[in-house]
């Protein structure tokens, strides 16, 4: 009886979660007029899709700069540099981001007034960089144990870590905002960036923490060119090292992590 109650509780949680995501998507789509941005992209079929490229930049952001990185971030950043193959690693900071990305004044005002957090600003930043330059975005807390080109097919126009989900959020394992790559001018970051701009022109507070994933979900559902790119990426394993942060180091456990997955978060 206890097992049945636990099972039904899990089912209820999944139903409630899916309902919340669905309602939030409708709010973003119609109340905040994202549907108007979608209309511009729905029927777009790129004539020539730029590949990610074997020498495209790897973008990593730590706002305060490398010297202010916590130890765990330094280790992750070092692993990215070590496994970058022929990709130059560019660290984006508060001091240099304007060398690579141009943001509208109203976005910068939202940031300076603290109406927008640095975390959310980094979502806009990654889409801006990928649209303008192409390349590979890696969050600064990703640990690589294999060379990047053994994970990504750089001849493709798009990559994100397609994985088996461990929860029922809007992502459904089809993509990750923390590991995303594409060629210059790709339709996905172009749409998401325009949708962000459209929202922040008229709002001074984020509608949801996972706003980027909600926009990704809308792109996947309504833009055939996006769903085609996403569905073309095979499922890959991903380990969650964050669950082990407070545990004593175990060499065998780490070796197991290394064999099960190529990236670790």
Residue ranges of model-derived segments:
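Short aromatic/hydrophobic "clamp" motif used to bind/position activated sugar donors
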Residues: 135-137
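Glycosyltransferase-associated regions of secretory-pathway enzymes
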Residues: 1-122, 140-263
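Small-residue hinge/turn detector
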Residues: 123-133
